Structure formats: structure tokens, C-alpha cells
UniProtKB/Swiss-Prot annotation:
Protein name according to UniProt: ATP synthase subunit alpha, mitochondrial
Site description Required for activity, residues in chain: S373
SUPFAM superfamilies documented for this protein: C-terminal domain of alpha and beta subunits of F1 ATP synthase, N-terminal domain of alpha and beta subunits of F1 ATP synthase, P-loop containing nucleoside triphosphate hydrolases
This protein's record includes keyword ATP-binding: yes
Binding site for ATP: G171, D172, R173, Q174, T175, G176, K177, T178
GO molecular function: ADP binding; ATP binding; proton-transporting ATP synthase activity, rotational mechanism
Comment field (misc): A stretch of 270 kb of the mitochondrial genome is duplicated within the centromere of chromosome 2 resulting in the duplication of the gene. The expression of this duplicated gene (At2g07698) is not demonstrated. It is also probably not RNA edited and therefore differs in all the positions known to be edited.
Keyword Ion transport appears in the UniProt entry: yes
Compartments it resides in: Mitochondrion; Mitochondrion inner membrane
């Protein structure tokens, strides 16, 4: 029987359709929850999952695979686990945990997953970056050589910080650690206003770990009032957030800061504080049944912080010359810097600023212990004029502390010792500074020059702050600008005449 032309055409059409038929099925690897509790879910069936991969629970909550065992996978839940039940389906996403990054993040407050929590709507144009990446290699780095000014006289003169450095802020609770960090963010306002190009601007990322929501709210208000939020990103994993989010927040903030570092820009990141991150990680590790070590922390708690802080770096000229400067904060208990976490972080960082309760209560604020505080690489980045002025400052303060300890026992001191005590008390007074009042570097140089060269020696202690205000208000702007370039003999003569005139008015 011969087919009609129409039937033959239909047959050919069906044959070609059958040959070209391809069913595009979406295949998901799924597992089932075996047990859940305390923010940890044990899941059976996810045989191909990667370490650090994101998973999705049936109720929409996300989680991350941390323990890969023979039978089950230990997953930390990023959110409430009350709605997750035994037998629920868990789906692999195929992607490692990532967060949004880019300039669209500036001025925003986000959680540890990068989701905005400030009520200003969704994020605009941004890119996704993995939270866990390898730190830049040796050849991709350059030694620190540009200053990162905090606006604090005691820090910029004695423990200078460079762009790309890691400087630890360590001290007991309520000693002013966060204040130093916030002052540093506020000080970038006047530096950014002078920046002529994008590569000179300093962007800031503040990561709040395990803090009260009220504290974070006050912080946002402080930054908003100073117009500092426009160049800052806030990542908040507060005390009420689950431990996995407190563990993740520093890595998320670091990924956001790395966007600027890798695109030839400069960023400052503050982790406030890493003690709480270590506690959150200990909680997760113990619930995942990992073996505990010293102080019940898991064996890899050093790696927890080292892999985070190594990502702060100054990039080489070939890779864009960007930088990421880190100011991690560690809270000590009763001044014990030899505990496990403090010693770990001290050994990882490029120096530390030690704050003491006793100094704080004596009214020396910022309460920096100059003897214990060091900056291992920052001096290479210090301005020439500041170096010239501060040469004798640290030595004189060290001699003062030594003599002051003995002076308590007797009053019959010779003239040289009396002069040393007198000078030391005035230098200590000059280094005091109110909170949220950072000073530009040229003004710091002027004030410290006056103190080091004896212009305050005959002045009563209670008049020193008055003298400081007087010289800062009446100095010529061109002389201030000239100070940045260094101290020549002509400038010294001009400065001496000006400072002497102002000092005589107050003695």
C-alpha cells in the first residue's frame, strides 16, 4: 500500500521529532533528616556533597555541610531549626556558600548571609563572592608602605598601622576597643574627602559578632550622624542569631572587603570580636561531636582565625595594588593575654594594641598600654614628619613608667628624675583624646611636637587640653600642610616661635 504525500510528510515529521526528542529533566540529589537539634542537622543520603556546600531544607531554611561522615552528613542550620523535623527532605544546591559584594553594599546593614536587614529594600547591582577563598600568595603581595591613619594620637605616633596590616585590639570588656575601631572609621571621612582618585579612598567593613542589637543600633546611629555610613558596610550577627551565623559573619565581611582589595581599592575591616566567633565555633564543633582540645576548643581553632586574617594583605602592583587592612578585636578575661585565643591571634597578627582597665579608670583614654603595644610593620608606613617627632616619645614614656613605679616609695628625688616625671605626665596627658573626635595627621604632628620639645613642661596638667585647642585653632593652614612633608630647620624655627608664644599665654 502506497502512502499519500501528506501521510509520508507526517511520517517523516514524526520520525525526526522522535530522533531529536530530549527530555530535560532536573535531577536533584536529596537526603533526609535523621536528627535535628541545637542548630545541627544529621542528614542521610547526600553521598556526593562537598564540604562547605550550601543545602536547602524543605521549609526554605539554608544550611552548610561541615561534617562528612560514612553514614550521615553533619549540617549547620543558618536560621531556626524548630520547623525542621525528622524525615524532612534536604536538597543539595551545588554551590559553596557565597555572599553579595560590590559598591551597592555601601551604606547597608546586612546579616551574615548578606541579606539586608536595614529595611532599605533589596540590593542593587552586585556580584556574588565565595565566603571561603584562599589568601593571596607570596608573589601577589607587597610589603606594607602606605599609612592607614586612625586619627588617634596614641596609635598613629606609637603603634602606627599601614594599609594591608593586621593589628589586634586586645583588652578586657569596657576598655574602649570598639571606640578605637569606630574612631578609625570616622577618621577615614576626612581622608576620603581629600582623595583625588578611587584608589586613594578607604572603604570600611564592620563585622559585629555576638553583640547586643541595641549596641549595633547605637553604632549605626553614630556612623549615620557622622556621614560615615556612605563608605561603610555593616555585617551583623547579633547575640540572638544562631551560632553558625556568628561563625560565618567574619568570612562574609571579609569577602565583601576583598572586592575592594582585588579591584585596586583600599578597605578596612573590623572584626568585633573574634572571641565570640571562637565560642560559636566551639559550640558547633562540640555539637558535631568533634574532639575537644585546650579550653574545650576544637583542634583547628587556630586555623579558624589564621585563614581569615591571612586574607588581609597589601597586593602587589601587578595585581592592582589594592589592600585590605584588618583590625580584629579580642576580649580578655581579667587581663589574661596568655589564654588560648588571645595568644593564637597575637601570633597571627602584625602587632597588637593592648588596652587596660586600670588606665581607663585613671582617665587615660584611649587606655593604651604603650609598653605592651607594638606594631611590627606599620613604622615603614609612618609619615616622615611623624617619625621625626616620635623618635624620643616612646623612650621617654618607657623611662617615665619605670621611674614612676619607684617614685611612689619616696619623695626625695633628684632634679633629673623630677624633670622626667614632669615630662612623662605631660606626654601622657597630650596622648589623651575624647571618643569620636579623630585628629588629622598634621594636627597630631603639631601637638606631639609641642609636647616632645618641652613647650608644655611648665604648664599645669589641667591646662594642656586648653593649650592643644589654642594651637590647633590659631595655626596657619599652610604651616599645617607643610608638616606632612617633613620638618626642615626653617619649619622648626617657625613652629618653635609660634608654640612658645601660645605657651607663654597659658603658663
Amino acid at each position: 500500500m502506497e502512502l499519500s504525500p501528506r501521510a509520508a510528510e507526517l511520517t517523516n515529521l514524526f520520525e525526526s521529532r522522535i530522533r531529536n526528542f530530549y527530555a530535560n529533566f532536573q535531577v536533584d540529589e536529596i537526603g533526609r533528616v535523621v536528627s535535628v537539634g541545637d542548630g545541627i542537622a544529621q542528614v542521610y543520603g547526600l553521598n556526593e556533597i562537598q564540604a562547605g556546600e550550601m543545602v536547602l531544607f524543605a521549609n526554605g531554611v539554608k544550611g552548610m555541610a561541615l561534617n562528612l561522615e560514612n553514614e550521615n552528613v553533619g549540617i549547620v542550620v543558618f536560621g531556626g531549626d524548630t520547623a525542621i523535623k525528622e524525615g524532612d527532605l534536604v536538597k543539595r544546591t551545588g554551590s559553596i556558600v557565597d555572599v553579595p559584594a560590590g559598591k551597592a553594599m555601601l551604606g547597608r546593614v546586612v546579616d551574615a548571609m548578606g541579606v539586608p536587614i536595614d529595611g532599605k529594600g533589596a540590593l542593587s547591582d552586585h556580584e556574588q563572592r565565595r565566603v571561603e577563598v584562599k589568601a593571596p600568595g607570596i608573589l601577589e603581595r607587597k610589603s606594607v608602605h602606605e599609612p592607614m591613619q586612625t586619627g588617634l594620637k596614641a596609635v598613629d605616633s606609637l603603634v602606627p598601622i599601614g594599609r594591608g596590616q593586621r593589628e589586634l585590639l586586645i583588652g578586657d570588656r569596657q576598655t574602649g576597643k570598639t571606640t578605637i575601631a569606630i574612631d578609625t572609621i570616622l577618621n577615614q571621612k576626612q581622608i576620603n574627602s581629600r582623595a583625588t582618585s578611587e584608589s586613594e579612598t578607604m572603604y570600611c567593613v564592620y563585622v559585629a559578632i555576638g553583640q547586643k542589637r541595641s549596641t549595633v543600633g547605637q553604632l549605626i546611629q553614630t556612623l549615620e550622624e557622622a556621614n560615615a555610613l556612605e563608605y561603610s558596610i555593616l555585617v551583623a550577627a547579633t547575640a540572638s542569631d544562631p551560632a553558625p551565623l556568628q561563625f560565618l559573619a567574619p568570612y562574609s565581611g571579609c569577602a565583601m572587603g576583598e572586592y575592594f582589595r582585588d579591584n585596586g581599592m583600599h578597605a578596612l575591616i573590623i572584626y568585633d570580636d573574634l572571641s565570640k566567633q571562637a565560642v560559636a565555633y566551639r559550640q558547633m564543633s562540640l555539637l558535631l561531636r568533634r574532639p575537644p582540645g585546650r579550653e574545650a576548643f576544637p583542634g583547628d581553632v587556630f586555623y579558624l582565625h589564621s585563614r581569615l586574617l591571612e586574607r588581609a594583605a597589601k597586593r602587589s602592583d601587578q595585581t592592582g595594588a589594592g589592600s585590605l587592612t584588618a583590625l580584629p578585636v579580642i576580649e580578655t578575661q581579667a587581663g589574661d593575654v596568655s589564654a588560648y585565643i588571645p595568644t593564637n591571634v597575637i601570633s597571627i597578627t602584625d602587632g597588637q594594641i593592648c588596652l587596660e582597665t586600670e588606665l581607663f579608670y585613671r582617665g587615660i583614654r584611649p587606655a593604651i598600654n604603650v609598653g605592651l603595644s607594638v606594631s611590627r610593620v606599620g613604622s615603614a608606613a609612618q609619615l616622615k614628619a611623624m617619625k621625626q617627632v616620635c623618635g624620643s616619645l616612646k623612650l621617654e614614656l618607657a623611662q617615665y613608667r619605670e621611674v614612676a613605679a619607684f617614685a611612689q616609695f619616696g619623695s626625695d628625688l633628684d632634679a633629673a628624675t623630677q624633670a622626667l616625671l614632669n615630662r612623662g605626665a605631660r606626654l601622657t596627658e597630650v596622648l589623651k583624646q575624647p571618643q569620636y573626635a579623630p585628629l588629622p595627621i598634621e594636627k597630631q604632628i603639631l601637638v606631639i611636637y609641642a609636647a616632645v620639645n618641652g613647650f608644655c613642661d611648665r604648664m599645669p596638667l589641667d591646662r594642656i587640653s586648653q593649650y592643644e585647642k589654642a594651637i590647633l585653632n590659631s595655626v596657619k593652614p599652610e604651616l599645617l600642610q607643610a608638616l606632612k612633608g617633613g620638618l626642615t630647620n626653617e619649619r622648626k624655627m617657625e613652629l618653635d616661635a609660634f608654640l612658645k608664644e601660645r605657651a607663654l599665654a597659658l603658663i
